[in-house]
Amino acid sequence: LKKLKDEGLLSGFEVRNLVVPNPVLPSFYCMPKTHKEGNKVRPVVANVNTPISKICDYLVKKFRTLKRPYSMSVKNSFETAERLAKETLTNEEVVVSFDVEALYPSVPVEEAYVLFSEWIDEQDISDVDAKLLVRLMRIVLDQRWLDYDGKVYRQKEGLFIGNAVSPILAEIFMGNIESKIKTSDWLPR
């Protein structure tokens, strides 16, 4: 953050607001998937009071002001229902939905970062703001350390479930795949 301040991308006030006093390592825990058969769990990395938690909050706040990455993405089930209500299907058509198993841990971090950078470049924001968002995302993605049972580990691949920026990165990554499918001859419309 000091380097971003020295480059004029952040003010001293902004740096102070992005620094977490007395931060802790993100901690790993599992949430049971009660809706699934067997003993399946969802691995979560708690990002509360960590070195990057305020940066993540800052980024998420900024993302809300930007255009959504892909027209096919939806905010919630209400928006899905609203969109489907506007569609008319023929008797030969069906609606399909896909669920990705372990989406966040399966997203390739560097590819998601490149796609994120491209998405930011398409936004109607200043070059300084764009550069800042991309650099802050790099800081977040480089922080891949976590605590589990008193030992420190580094997650090599995928996004953390529990990190506030993971949803937008996953949306950008999946949207890129959907966009490629939509522009191919794989789908009728």
Predicted regions and their residues:
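Conserved pre-motif C helix in the palm subdomain of viral-like polymerases
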Residues: 25-71, 101-105, 154-183
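Non-catalytic, polymerase-adjacent accessory regions of viral genome-replication enzymes
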Residues: 1-28, 37
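Conserved polymerase palm-domain catalytic core
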Residues: 73-74, 79-82, 86-189
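Short amphipathic alpha-helical segments, especially helix-boundary/capping motifs
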Residues: 3-5, 32-37, 55-57, 89-93, ...
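Short charge-dense sequence patches
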Residues: 2-14, 60-69, 116-129, 164-165
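Hydrophobic, conserved cores of late-appearing folded domains
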Residues: 14, 21-28, 32, 94, ...
